[in-house]
From Swiss-Prot:
Superkingdom per UniProt: Bacteria
Function: Multidrug efflux pump.
Family: Belongs to the multi antimicrobial extrusion (MATE) (TC 2.A.66.1) family.
GO molecular function, one term: antiporter activity
Protein name, entry field: Probable multidrug resistance protein NorM
One Gene Ontology cellular component annotation held by this UniProt entry: plasma membrane
Amino acid sequence: MQQTVTYGAKWKQFLTIFTPIVITQLTLFSMTFFDTTMSGNYSNQALAGVAIGSSFWAPVNAAFSGLLMAITPIIAQLIGAKKEKQVKNTVHNGLYIALFLAFILILINFLVVPTILTHMPVTAEVAHIARHFLNGICIGIPAFFISAILRSFIDSLGLTRVTMLITLCTVPFNIFLNYCFIFGNFGFPEMGGAGSGYATGITYWLVVLVSVILIQTQTRLRKFGIFKGLTALRFSKVKEIIGIGVPNGLTILFETSIFSAVTILMGAFGTETIAAHQSANSVCTLLYAFPLSVASTLTILGGYETGAKRLKDAKQYRHIGMTAAILIGCINGAILFFFRDIIAGFYTNDAELSDLIMHFLVYAILFQFADAVLSPVLGALRGYKDVAITSIIAFISYWLIGLPVGYGLSFTNLGPFGYWIGLSTGLFVAAFILSIRVRKTERKLSLNAKNAEISS
C-alpha cells in the first residue's frame, strides 16, 4: 500500500486490493455452495441435514473469524504509523487466542450440540446427518482459526493476492474430497451429507500448510519473521485484540445467527422448505462475497490511512467503497430476478422444490440493497477501530426488530417468506443507524487531529 493523491489513484488502489479479496471470498463461499449442491444431489434429507449443521457452524465460523479479524486494522494502522516491529507480536497473540477458542468450540460440539439436536423439530435422520457433519468440521477447527489469523496478517499488508493464491490452491481439493466422502468414490466411505463436513475439516489443514509455505517464501512476508521463535503472551495486546474483536465478532454473530435461527424455525414448514431456504441462502451467501470484500478493503485502507494520520484520505476511500457496493448491489439484484429459474436448477430437479427456491430468491433481492449500504459502513468503522457500539445496534436491529417482524409475517399468507422480509427489515435498520455513526466517528477523529496539531 502507498499514499495516493487523486481519486483515480485511490480507485486503482481500492480495486487492486478489492479484486483478490472478492475472488478469495467467492472461492471460499463456493465451498458452501458445493457442500449444498452436492449434498442436495445425494438426497433432500442430506441437504436438510447439511442445512441444520451449517446453521450451527456458520454463525460460529463468522463470529470467531470476526473476532480474530481484529488484527487486520491493528496491523494496518501499525504499518501506516511505521511501527512494523510490533507486527510479529500482534500475530502471535492472535494465534494464542485462536488456539484457545478452537479448544473451547471442540468441547462445546461434543458436550452440548447433541442435546440441542435432539430437541429440534427435525427428523432423526436429518439430526443424525447434522451431527456427523459437525464432527467432520471439528477436525479442522484449530486449522481454520490459525488460517484466519494468518490471512488477516497477509491482508492487512495489502497483499491480498497472496490470500487469493492460497484459496485457489485449496478449494479444488475440497470439491474433490466432497465427491469422495459424500458419494463414496475412489474407495472412500459413502457418508452422504455428513461427508461434506469431513471434506471441509480436512481442507482447513491444507489451507494452513499452504499459508505457512507462502509466508516463508514471499520476501514481503518473510521479513516480519512470524515463524522465527515465539514472542511472549502480552496481556495488553490480547486486551487490544479482544477489545476490537469481541464487538466485531458479536456484530457478525448477531447477523449470521439470525439467519441460522430462521433456518431452525423453518423446520415448522417441513423438510422441503428447509431445503429451499438453505439453497436460496447459499446463493445469497455467495453474492454477499462482494459487499463483504468491499468492507474488508475499507478496513485495510481505512486502517492504513488512519494510522498515517490521513483522515481525509480514509473518508474518501469510504465514499469509493459505498459507490462500488451500491453498483454491485444493483447487479446482484438483477441476477437474482432474471436468472432465478436457472439458479434454482443448480440445486434440484424437483419442480416443487425449484419453485420454492425461486420465490425465496425474489425476496433475497432486498438483502442486496441493504448489504450495499451496511457492509462498507461496517468496514470503515473497523478501520477506524470504532466497533464498540456496532454489536449493540446489530442485536437490536436483527433480533429485536427483524426476527419479531419475520415471525409475525410467517403467520400471514406469506408463510416462510415472511421471515426473509423480517431479515431485510433488520438489515436496513442497522444500515441506517450505522451510516449515522460512521459520519459521527469521522467528525470526531478529524476534531481530535486538529486539537493535536494545535497543542503541538
